[in-house]
């Protein structure tokens, strides 16, 4: 009974920690979006994207509103988006997207995570050529004629479309475009009133790397350490 309780408690705390990290990431995204385009989502496509992501994560409305209010104030911390590059064990390329108010702290922490987990932090451009920055939309596929939608969206920047599975096993329709077409495709999806669950820019690996189970575990230990860092927003890699 005791062990079962401890296991459940550990699982619960892990879920809470993951949720807290996700809410912190969204709050920073809100701050960056508001600084770039103002607090009114009607006039700020970047903020609309972040609010979609917040709803998908079930972030409480009061927390979202508080984040927008803070971001609109004079005392809001100014976050800088900085991307770091490096290699995980076994030559896996890694891109680390951060949002920081202290670059000196962040670069030191990212370098430490690479070093402590068998990787090497690289210079700008050392692995970026192995990725392509893209706009990625995830939608609920129910009621969508995918063939018709694909033809319809090609003129708005769509490059790739396919089905995937979410963390909870739910079916997702994933749509990708060049990063330069992100806003155009977002507008097209909004105009068609489709159920967009999330919309983010991602570094998509061009040539995924296959590894054995033990080697992959070593890579994912580094990824996990990076994702736990308070300044890290996203970690992208080319592990298949």
UniProtKB/Swiss-Prot annotation:
Fetch the SUPFAM superfamilies from UniProt: YebC-like
Major subcellular location class: cytoplasm
- List GO BP terms, alphabetically: regulation of DNA-templated transcription
- Mind telling me which residue stretches traverse the membrane in this protein? none
Q: Where in the cell is it found?
A: Cytoplasm
Q: Which Pfam families match?
A: TACO1_YebC_N, Transcrip_reg
One of the entry's Gene Ontology molecular-function terms is: DNA binding
Show the Gene3D superfamilies listed in the entry.
1.10.10.200, 3.30.70.980
Keywords assigned by UniProt, alphabetized? Cytoplasm, DNA-binding, Transcription, Transcription regulation
One Gene Ontology cellular component annotation held by this UniProt entry: cytosol
Instruction: State the NCBIfam families in the record.
Output: PRK12378.1, YebC/PmpR family DNA-binding transcriptional regulator
Q: Which family does it belong to?
A: Belongs to the TACO1 family.
For this entry, the protein name equals: Probable transcriptional regulatory protein AnaeK_1694
Q: Which organism is it from?
A: Anaeromyxobacter sp. (strain K)
Q: What is the lineage of its organism?
A: Bacteria, Pseudomonadati, Myxococcota, Myxococcia, Myxococcales
């Amino acid at each position: 009974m005791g062990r079962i309780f401890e296991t459940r408690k550990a699982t619960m705390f892990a879920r809470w920690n993951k949720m807290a990290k996700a809410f912190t990431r969204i709050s920073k995204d809100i701050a960056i979006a508001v600084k770039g385009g103002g607090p009114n989502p009607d006039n700020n496509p970047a903020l609309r994207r972040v609010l979609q992501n917040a709803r998908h994560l079930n972030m409480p409305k009061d927390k979202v509103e508080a984040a927008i209010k803070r971001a609109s104030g004079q005392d809001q911390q100014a976050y800088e988006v900085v991307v770091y590059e490096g290699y995980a064990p076994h030559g896996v390329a890694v891109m680390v997207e951060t949002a920081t108010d202290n670059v000196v702290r962040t670069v030191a922490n990212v370098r430490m995570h690479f070093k402590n987990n068998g990787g090497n932090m690289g210079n700008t451009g050392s692995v970026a050529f192995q990725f392509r920055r893209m706009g990625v939309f995830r939608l609920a596929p129910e009621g969508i004629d995918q063939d018709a939608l694909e033809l319809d969206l090609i003129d708005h920047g769509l490059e790739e479309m396919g089905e995937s599975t979410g963390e909870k096993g739910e079916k997702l329709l994933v749509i990708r475009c060049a990063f330069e077409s992100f806003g155009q495709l977002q507008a097209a999806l909004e105009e068609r009133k489709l159920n967009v669950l999330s919309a983010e820019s991602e570094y998509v690996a061009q040539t995924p790397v296959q590894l054995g189970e033990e080697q992959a575990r070593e890579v994912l230990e580094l990824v996990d350490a990076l994702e736990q860092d308070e300044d890290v927003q996203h970690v992208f890699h080319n592990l298949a």
